Amino acid sequence: MKFTLVATVLLTFSLSAFAVEYPVLTTASPDQVGFDSQKLHRLDGWIQNQIDAGYPSINLLVIKDNHIVLQKAWGYAKKYDGSTLLAHPIRATTNTMYDLASNTKMYATNFALQKLVYEGKIDVNDLVSKYIPGFKDMPGDKIKGKNKLRIIDILHHVAGFPADPQYPNKNVAGKLFSQSKSTTLEMIKKTPLEYQPGSKHIYSDVDYMILGFIIESITAMPLDRYVETTIYKPLGLKHTVFNPLMKGFTPPQIAATELHGNTRDGVIHFPNIRTNTLWGQVHDEKAWYSMGGVSGHAGLFSDTHDMAVLMQVMLNGGGYGNVKLFDDKTVAQFTRRSPEDATFGLGWRVNGNASMTPTFGVLASPQTYGHTGWTGTLTSIDPVNHMAIVILGNRPHSPVANPKVNPNVFVSGLLPAATYGWIVDQIYGSLK
């Protein structure tokens, strides 16, 4: 009996020694973790001034030392129906879900890849062609190199692909036109390289569309199902999904974006273009028309609390609570600066030089990494200060400033709130 009891105790101790329990987020007052509350709360008035000036909404959450110290929403999830200002606009709340745009690249695609790398199911030095049959140089290609492209080249954005081929717009895409997922993969294979791979960095949506297809090839699952069932559900995330309107969410739970579909107030036209105010559907054209709302480069929706958990996973070195997705070595591998450009990791943008000041401000540590999204989203993760910031916004939910001059500049994009670094600096400047 004594031997059995001792053996049981030793076995329990042995198992607990190997069990990993990661920090989970709790709330704390700013003063408890080194902030000057009065300075931090000055942001309140400044952001409200930006809302009064026409910025649609801002949702902000700040993490310090495993604590949420600030979480607040300003403005409106929906204030327009087309060009008409609503008599009773829908206020944003801290539970409002936002179109993450290119932050999808990190919190869907990169998280999936980091998990698969940790599990030994993929190596970043593998050739792309290992996972995508027929991915090779085409006859007549002026620039060769697809045959030798590795996943790491795609992650570093040095693969040679153009930034935005605009597959769903036949007027621009020409022979590469596609408004179906299966056709889009074939068009990606046919997309000519614009520069010799490895010769420069060009941030490209195509790179992450390819990575999404690679994840689906490895897992034999659609990208959304894979991340939602193996990453978000184990973490207890309730509001992080692709195609939210197909998964039980309703428009009032989500921040609206462009006023007239993807027409930029009526100056852009192509077959099947949406013209209604976008509300609960991904704004990105390639993600919506060419990929059915689920793509490696865009399509994910979330709220600030769920995003905080995902950022805490990175600060924790790969896990949260009793859930382990990957390890600290994987985090280091993916956030290490590219030797060619210090502002790129493996997908992650890194605070490598002054060019990242508009994103990360001037006070974040050089080791800070994160990403931005075209709809008005920022994630900033600072392992030195053990701090993270998420800003979610719906910047395109305002008129286009001058559609004929530049259809991609919205009135709200001309306001200071559109520059994330300023907000980030006010937060860091509030540290004692």
Swiss-Prot record:
Catalytic function, reaction form: Preferential cleavage: (Ac)2-L-Lys-D-Ala-|-D-Ala. Also transpeptidation of peptidyl-alanyl moieties that are N-acyl substituents of D-alanine
Primary location group: membrane
Record's protein name: Putative D-alanyl-D-alanine carboxypeptidase
Compartments where found: Cell inner membrane
Transmembrane segments: 7-25
Organism: Salmonella typhimurium (strain LT2 / SGSC1412 / ATCC 700720)
Gene Ontology CC terms: plasma membrane
Annotated membrane topology: Single-pass membrane protein
